[in-house]
């Protein structure tokens, strides 16, 4: 089987550690090629053929005879490999747009949309790349947007292979909160763009059951859920519960996640009035504001630990009792992350820790953990203290829920099971295409 990937980012395991492409396709019996739209270089052990179109090329195509798109090779010498390990997206025009978008997000994104829908592709080079590879299926993991939709339609015109999409985000619904008229203008444009673009896909994978049903109802496209896989090859080994019980959060503090951690800290302050029975360690590479530093403090049994690499994080989890999955409870961020299923959830299942999820009850990750009884679940700040008090008073619950999390992962998220799901769908659509020829 020959699989052609169309993605926004380069497949680089140094820049995007533990990414879904490597997670899904390591050991997958197939050949891979990738078309991507970022300036970085690829670095992985799975894919060998690449075609790059980036923003700099697209801008240049607007004022010169040079068209955008070229085949690139995997870095081989030490200098090229070092360059691949650095985040190329922080450089050049792409990096400039990234920085500016922090201050004026929607205008910059609309400018990027304009560049990508008016820039000129090197269609001859792209056609040669596709003809030389002859894909059996085209897979598009994406956050749908005008850039990707135009590229996907172009590739669709160059091959009769079936197209399959995956999204883990709210691509174009109106369930958002934003005061900017420009945001809603672009949202309207994307909503209509998705209606026209979804027609090229024979199947749509996504994390959220609710979103999958919405897409089937509104666009008529077949859908199903698809999650990350994890390592559940060993038998579950019960470990003793620490004293104090140790909670761990590892990840970013954005989208007001830090405010949820503050509420946990407030509950810990109450629990620990007569001695430290439960603590929270936070591992993040983000610099704290003064407000965050004051709220996330040892006074509330919250300890900031800095950043760790993936291997070190495994050791952190081995020495912890409960791993946290948290999202913001404010309306804007609740809606923004509603259909997002953090890829870390599967890692937490395999971590040997119990999981505590503090999220909105319509968040798809929360719903999944709750429906599978794979975590302690809290959907209201006022319920954090009672839940933590219950755990402190009954430490054996930690062991019980650590096992439940692991068994859920073992039942639903082994590499064999997830890869079989992907392969079966790809083979089904390839066979259907051949039958119709």
Language-model segments: residues:
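Nucleotide-sugar-dependent
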Residues: 256-259, 313, 323-349, 355-367
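Carbohydrate-associated surface elements
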Residues: 210, 228-229
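A short, active-site helix/loop in glycosyltransferases that binds the activated sugar's phosphate group
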Residues: 39, 192, 196-223, 366, ...
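A charged, aromatic-enriched C-terminal amphipathic alpha-helix characteristic of glycosyltransferases
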Residues: 379-382, 386, 395-427
